[in-house]
Amino acid sequence: MARDVKEKLATERTVKLPRHVRFFTRQSRKGLPAPACAVALERGIRIPMPDGTNQLADRYVPQTCEPCPTLLVRTPYGRGFPYDFMYGALLAEHGYNVLLQSTRGTGGSGGSYEPFTDEAADAQATIAWLREQPWFNGSLATIGASYLGFTQWALANDPPPELKAMVVQVSAEDFHGFLYPGGAFAMEATLTGVAAMLSQDQGFRPFTGAVLRLMLTYRKVARMLPLVPGYKLAFGKRVGDLEDWLAHPAARPLATSAAPVAIARVAR
């Protein structure tokens, strides 16, 4: 009975793909195999976490009667452009359930956004929820770039038996080397990354505005010593996580402890 109710609720939330998603998906098909099926969108799914908060997700639903494997994408950058077509519709039309999930404190998800901190536990809670879904057939893969790759390594710390593959793009399981390559603070790269994390889930215009603001103020920020609180010129406010990274250059809070060798534990 509970399974029937879940299926009914999922059907009621399912809508057609937005026009911009259909457009960019068509443009991205060039050179790819023809779509295997049509795709619908189930928006605003609430995934419960152990602390009582919920994380929001959208599911791109392949319109086929066959049981479909699931692709999990966990991101702090929002569930809109470009992830909606690039990972969502484009992969779903080849027979995958694509679950695009906003990480803690981003994109409407509950809790506080503390980069790199809760990804392992939240990923495991997501897998537990997946097991209860009538459309989940027990076959799981993950995909994503940059921070979306880090969320995959966080899951790989203790890979669930359902995990069959990971597609980690331009990412790392330890971001300390990104902040301090060779031991020196990478100011431009770090500030650019912070600008993206602070604004990308707010939509295209706020994101581009934040990047432009950083470009216009970077030279002034680079001349300011100490960098804390000088960097505020770039963002208009203080960023606690950035100050923690600057205050503890030898600490490695950004590592998952999952080295690439962890992939050997993923079920084949």
Model-identified regions with their sequence ranges:
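Accessory cap/linker subdomain of secreted extracellular hydrolases
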Residues: A2-K16, N157-P159, A165-V266
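Alpha/beta-hydrolase active-site loop
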Residues: E114-P134
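Short glycine-enriched nucleophile-adjacent loop
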Residues: L148-P160
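N-terminal targeting or regulatory segments adjacent to alpha/beta-hydrolase or S9 domains
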Residues: M1-A40
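N-terminal cap/lid segment of alpha/beta-hydrolase-fold proteins
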Residues: T25-E66
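Catalytic nucleophile serine of serine hydrolases
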Residues: S146-G149, V170
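Alpha/beta-hydrolase fold nucleophile elbow
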Residues: P134-Y147
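Short substrate-entry loop that stabilizes the transition state in hydrolases
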Residues: T64-C68, L72-G110
